[in-house]
Every structure is written in C-alpha cells, then in structure tokens.
A protein has these predicted regions:
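Mid-sequence helix-capping/hinge segment at a functional interface
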Residues: 1-35, 40, 186
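A short acidic, often aromatic-flanked loop/helix-cap motif at beta-alpha or helix-coil junctions
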Residues: 6, 88-91, 147-150
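Secondary-structure boundary motif
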Residues: 13, 17, 52, 74-78, ...
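Donor-binding and catalytic core of enzymes assembling or modifying cell-surface/extracellular glycoconjugates
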Residues: 39-125
Length: 186
C-alpha cells in the first residue's frame, strides 16, 4: 500500500478540500453492524471541536455510510466534508496518509490507517481489540470492557450499546490530542 502525493493533490482539488487546514479522518462505518459504531452525534460533536481548532474533517466510508457522513458533516459544520461513496480505496489511502490523525470504529479502514502509520483512535464496542487490534504503534484503543462485552453481535442484544455510548467525546478528544498537536505535520 503506497500513498500517491499527486493523488492527494488531485483529490484536494476534485473534492474541494481546504488547502490551509490539516485533515482528520473519521471512519464511522462498520460493515458488521451498529454494535461496532460509535454514535453519529458523538462523531459530530468531536468534528465540531476539531473544526473550531482549525482542522478539517474528512468523513470516509462507502456509499452505505453516506447518510451518517451527511449527519456528521452537518453537525461538525463548515470545514467538515462527507466523502462517503465519493472515493475509491486508493483515494482513502491517499487521504489517510496525509491526515494528521483518524478516529475510527473497528473496521477495514481502521486497519488501512494502521498499516499507513496514521495516528488513530480506535473505538471498540461489540468486538475486542484482543482479537482484531490496529497493528500500529501510532494507535490508541478505547475499549470499555463492560461485563456484557465483547458480545460479538451485530446489534446490541441488551438494546443499549453502552459499550459505545459510554465512550465520551472528551475521552476521544484527549486520546487524539497528542497526534493533533505533534510538531511535525504528516
């Protein structure tokens, strides 16, 4: 997997991304199901904070993730871009390689970000980082390890998904902060 600097320049122009702000990737999807997805309003609130701090947010995912990406971009405000369904895997590689950091559910794109060495915060709900961790020293994992998790179910069998709703935006922001404020940009 090799990022293409020319590919990123093309994408920035094609997708109208901001040239003067570092990007942070959000990957809110998880093909397995909603029990692996951090709440959309939480992504939106985190995105709003990042935009206020001078970052732009790139929401990545498949066309199936477009509604979630729309909601996140709306909640985060100007400087957040829903790229779900608008990019190919090679484009996601270029965006992740250029991003200052990423916030992600346990998903395929999480593993792509880890392989690229992108600093990331990985959020685990119904799965466990003991089975499918991001293989990177630049990864921070947040996993509550509740009595009911990991359940490995697609939807929460108890109907509450506390394993994800219990992960607060502040906790994710704190885990993300060192990567955002690193002196050397990626």
């Amino acid at each position: 997997m090799q990022p293409d600097p020319a590919g990123f320049a093309r994408l920035r122009a094609q997708l109208d991304l901001l040239a003067d702000r570092p990007g942070v990737c959000f990957m809110p999807g998880a093909e397995y199901g909603p029990a692996k997805q951090w709440p959309i309003p939480s992504y939106g609130e985190l995105g709003r904070r990042l935009v206020r701090q001078g970052f732009q947010v790139w929401v990545l995912g498949s066309a199936k993730d477009k509604p979630a990406g729309d909601e996140i971009a709306t909640l985060a405000g100007e400087g957040a871009f829903n790229l779900c369904g608008r990019t190919e895997l090679a484009d996601a590689v270029d965006l992740l390689a250029t991003a200052r950091a990423a916030v992600t559910n346990d998903s395929g794109l999480m593993h792509v970000a880890a392989a690229l060495g992108t600093p990331l915060v990985a959020l685990y709900g119904s799965s466990t980082p003991h089975h499918t961790p991001p293989l990177s020293d630049a990864a921070q994992v947040i996993y509550l390890g509740l009595e009911c998790s990991p359940c490995f179910k697609r939807t929460c069998p108890l109907g509450h998904t506390r394993c994800l709703t219990g992960i607060g935006v502040e906790r994710v922001a704190e885990a993300l902060a060192p990567a955002l404020h690193a002196t050397a940009p990626r």
